[in-house]
Amino acid sequence: MQNITQSWFVQGMIKATTDAWLKGWDERNGGNLTLRLDDADIALYHDNFHPQPRYIPLSQPMPLLANTPFIVTGSGKFFRNVQLDPAANLGVVKVDSDGAGYHILWGLTNEAVPTSELPAHFLSHCERIKATNGKDRVIMHCHATNLIALTYVLENDTAVFTRQLWEGSTECLVVFPDGVGILPWMVPGTDEIGQATAQEMQKHSLVLWPFHGVFGSGPTLDETFGLIDTAEKSAEVLVKVYSMGGMKQTISREELIALGQRFGVTPLASALAL
């Protein structure tokens, strides 16, 4: 029998959650991670599935995700513990044929359930599927320290925040030319914040929740982790620069344009115009 804990997707989730914990982005049960799979990914592991999978209805139907499997982190679970007991802290779920709910096929033992941010994840998956023609498969939410810190001192405006991050590190414009979406502060774990996040995900692969954390999307676990890591590194640089009295020189608008041309990306116009 094939052991699902040795599958590429369980091992990938273990690595991503462990790395995020070691970065200091996911204290206690902070953060959540979902990866969209294909039936072929889970086909070898049916013998590992629960004999009577639990069914959980969604708060709103998502027909775009019908019959789609995901691997998800659990509600109230600590990222630091995923590596110790994957079956207790992760779960493979599959949305039903009409997108009204999902079955827990594997993991989430002892009656555990998926992350409370599942509405935000699933809604964001829907938008990123449309925005990237199905290329994006990962949604990651974490409490990246310096990005959170900047939401207290920068104007919480997409153009302003994006431009500052682009100037904080040369690679940022290349990695996220579409900029960073920003929400107003909202209560987490609700359909409302999920809908607002998904709306920003139509235009941006990164979305900030002020005073809380960040959502990132990408085609793989590595790409999504790297996206957030890149933005967080720039935020760390900016926090240090501001604490030293602010910028005396920076990357100019003309240099940002040249950077975009060199790497074949189109920078967010509103950020470039500042």
Curated annotation (Swiss-Prot):
Source organism: Escherichia coli O157:H7
UniProt-annotated catalytic positions: 117
An MF annotation (GO) of this entry: metal ion binding
GO biological process, one term: rhamnose catabolic process
Pathway membership: Carbohydrate degradation; L-rhamnose degradation; glycerone phosphate from L-rhamnose: step 3/3
Similarity field: Belongs to the aldolase class II family. RhaD subfamily.
Residues that bind Zn(2+): 141, 143, 212
Official protein name in the record: Rhamnulose-1-phosphate aldolase
EC number, UniProt record: 4.1.2.19
Catalytic activity: L-rhamnulose 1-phosphate = (S)-lactaldehyde + dihydroxyacetone phosphate
InterPro entries listed in its UniProt record: Aldolase_class_II_sugar_metab (IPR050197), Aldolase_II/adducin_N (IPR001303), Aldolase_II/adducin_N_sf (IPR036409), Rhamnulose-1-P_Aldolase (IPR013447)
Superkingdom: Bacteria
Subunit (UniProt): Homotetramer.
Cited function: Catalyzes the reversible cleavage of L-rhamnulose-1-phosphate to dihydroxyacetone phosphate (DHAP) and L-lactaldehyde.
Keywords: Cytoplasm, Lyase, Metal-binding, Rhamnose metabolism, Zinc
GO cellular component: cytosol
Cofactor needs: Zn(2+)
Pfam families recorded: Aldolase_II (PF00596)
NCBIfam families: PRK03634.1, rhamnu_1P_ald
SUPFAM superfamilies: AraD/HMP-PK domain-like
Organismal lineage: Bacteria, Pseudomonadati, Pseudomonadota, Gammaproteobacteria, Enterobacterales
Cellular localization per UniProt: Cytoplasm
PANTHER family with a match to the protein in the record: FUCULOSE PHOSPHATE ALDOLASE, RHAMNULOSE-1-PHOSPHATE ALDOLASE
Cofactor annotation comment: Binds 1 zinc ion per subunit.
